Amino acid sequence: MNKEVFATKTAIILGDRDGIPGQAIEACIKTTGAHVAFSTTECFVUTSAGAMDLENQKRIKALADEFGAENIIVILGGAEAEASGLACETVTTGDPTFAGPLAGVQLGLSCYHVVEDAIKEAVDPAVYEEQIGMMEMVLDVDAIKAEMQQYREEPVEA
């Protein structure tokens, strides 16, 4: 993904207290020219059954309605592959726990983890290294990439 793609996107950032915080992701994403509409840092593993925070689901749905799903990109900072995958599933095919506003709602949003190559290559390398480089060394980046790819490859039913 290149910077030109980001210039037309509205970013929703879901950082993780135990992974990469929203503020660090936001600093990176701002170097791409994307408009950051919402940025937060949550505890992915603290929420019940790994479900996305209900208020965040509500906010994401409202932003998708406001800007159009095709104009949104969700960037995650989860420490664990499985938790990141659940968040990705929630914003693409709907809340798998059926607990929140996105239960049964297939937004089909583009969703990436900040350590994925598509994001890393679009971000200013110096800012990425400063904000994320240290955490990248302790995360299981390969597992995160594989999990995220799996959810992007699942078809979203209309």
UniProtKB/Swiss-Prot annotation:
InterPro entries in alphabetical order: GRDA
GO molecular function, one term: sarcosine reductase activity
Function in brief: In the first step of glycine, betaine and sarcosine reductases, the substrate is bound to component PB via a Schiff base intermediate. Then the PB-activated substrate is nucleophilically attacked by the selenol anion of component PA to transform it to a carboxymethylated selenoether and the respective amine. By action of component PC, acetyl phosphate is formed, leaving component PA in its oxidized state. Finally component PA becomes reduced by the thioredoxin system to start a new catalytic cycle of reductive deamination.
Gene Ontology terms: cellular component: glycine reductase complex
Originating species: Photobacterium profundum (strain SS9)
Known partners and oligomeric status: Monomer. Component of the glycine, sarcosine and betaine reductase complexes, together with components B and C.
Signal peptide location: none
Record EC number: 1.21.4.2, 1.21.4.3, 1.21.4.4
Catalysed transformations (reactions): acetyl phosphate + [thioredoxin]-disulfide + NH4(+) + H2O = [thioredoxin]-dithiol + glycine + phosphate + H(+); acetyl phosphate + methylamine + [thioredoxin]-disulfide + H2O = sarcosine + [thioredoxin]-dithiol + phosphate + H(+); acetyl phosphate + trimethylamine + [thioredoxin]-disulfide + H2O = glycine betaine + [thioredoxin]-dithiol + phosphate + H(+)
Name the UniProt record assigns to this protein: Glycine/sarcosine/betaine reductase complex component A1
Family that this chain belongs to: Belongs to the GrdA family.
Active-site residues, record numbering mapped to chain: U46
Pfam family for this entry, one: GRDA
This protein's record includes keyword Oxidoreductase: yes
Keyword hit for Nucleotide-binding: no
UniProt keyword terms in alphabetical order: Oxidoreductase, Selenocysteine
